[in-house]
Amino acid sequence: MLSKDLLEALNDQMNHEYFAAHAYMAMAAYCDDASYEGFANFYIQQAKEERFHGKKIYDYINDRGEHAEFKSIPAPKTEFKSILETFKDGLAQEQDVTRRFYNLSEIAQKDKDYATISFLNWFLDEQVEEESTFETHIDYLNRIGDDCNTLYLYEKELAARSFDEE
């Protein structure tokens, strides 16, 4: 049985994962509108990954005999000035998610809920990868600058990205 605080935090995080999926779809829409289909694909795959994370938390809550509680998801930001801005926003979002998982881990440790600590370790490892991915893209976009040919090639590389549930 999960403590009240831990269940509430897990439900909040599950809902936040679905919000993150919406935010990435808004970034995909911006990219599609700007005719950057490769970048749009990157964000569509990110959204799939966030929905997978939400479902993983949903399953865990249910496996622990508790009730997953869905809440209203606020509308994400939909206006961006550049592709680089979408990646900076994505990094900030992932950093926020990392902080949220640290908080969840602290609650689980306080509760001595070792099963949840083990469950959350997967997400903590995942967040290292997520932040690194966004930092790499930001660095690369900064290096590309206004070089349209290199940006075109980079975008084509991202068009091939796909998400497979682990």
Swiss-Prot record:
Gene3D superfamilies named among the record's database cross-references: 1.20.1260.10
Subcellular localization, as worded in the UniProt entry: Cytoplasm
Enzyme Commission number(s) from the entry: 1.16.3.2
All residue ranges annotated as the Ferritin-like diiron domain in the record: 2-145
Any one GO molecular-function label of the UniProt entry: ferroxidase activity
BP term (GO), one: intracellular iron ion homeostasis
Top EC class for this record: oxidoreductase
Entry GO terms, CC: cytosol
Catalytic reactions on record: 4 Fe(2+) + O2 + 6 H2O = 4 iron(III) oxide-hydroxide + 12 H(+)
Alphabetized InterPro entries for the sequence: Ferritin, Ferritin-like, Ferritin-like_diiron, Ferritin-like_SF, Ferritin_DPS_dom, Ferritin_prok
Keywords: Cytoplasm, Iron, Iron storage, Metal-binding, Oxidoreductase
Positions contributing to Fe cation 2 binding: E50, E94, Q127
Residues annotated as binding Fe cation 1: E17, E50, H53
A Pfam family the protein falls into: Ferritin
General function of this protein: Iron-storage protein.
Family membership: Belongs to the ferritin family. Prokaryotic subfamily.
Name the UniProt record assigns to this protein: Bacterial non-heme ferritin
Gene that encodes the chain: ftnA
